[in-house]
Amino acid sequence: MKEKVEKLAIFDLDDTIYDGNSHFALLNHYYNTCIFTSIFMKVIGKICPSFHMKICYWAYNRIPQNIRRNFVLPYRQRIIKLMNEKRHEGYHLVIVSNAPEDLLQAASRRLNVLAVRAEFGKKSKVVKERYCYQKVFVCTDNKTDIDLLQLSDEAVITCKRGNREYFLKRLKGKNYQFIDEGDEI
């Protein structure tokens, strides 16, 4: 049964709420390396994304669960402020992310916000299945969230200036604004 909310505010986790990608940051931290965010791994991710993710999940699943459940990154304070504004405006807040479940729930507990996991490109499907809403706000950095952004009445996109064109071409007629990565109030 769908949850009925008048106003829904959807936030992505990695590189949106968090100042970084929690999955890769935990891998680098735990294994005391930078290999998981290296150029080499980025190339593997572009050439063979499924193999790249298999490697990452293989390494991730070997990290003790208590470490995975408690790992958090620094928050982007501008987004935390935006979350508080949306809460004050009466929005029902939810984090929708494809981050590993342990990392997603760690953020959920610390921020006192419901978190829902969705596969790449499936966030809008998960939202439509779970919620009935009148108005939706989306905050993300992901190019793969275009379908979610197209559902929105209002959006904030956190990205590098060089990536704006991608969103501009696909979101004609939408009410959105950009926050440049690294910008803080």
Q: Residue spans of the language-model regions?
A:
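C-terminal cap/substrate-recognition subdomain and adjoining C-terminal extension
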Residues: 1-8, 71-185
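Sequence-level detector for tyrosine residue identity
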Residues: 18, 24, 30-31, 52, ...
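Active-site neighborhood of HAD-like aspartate-dependent phosphohydrolases
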Residues: 1-55
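Short, basic/glycine-rich phosphate-binding loops at helix/coil junctions
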Residues: 50-67, 107-111
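Exposed alpha-helical structural elements
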Residues: 22-26, 39, 43, 54-59, ...
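N-terminal leader/targeting helix
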Residues: 15, 62-78
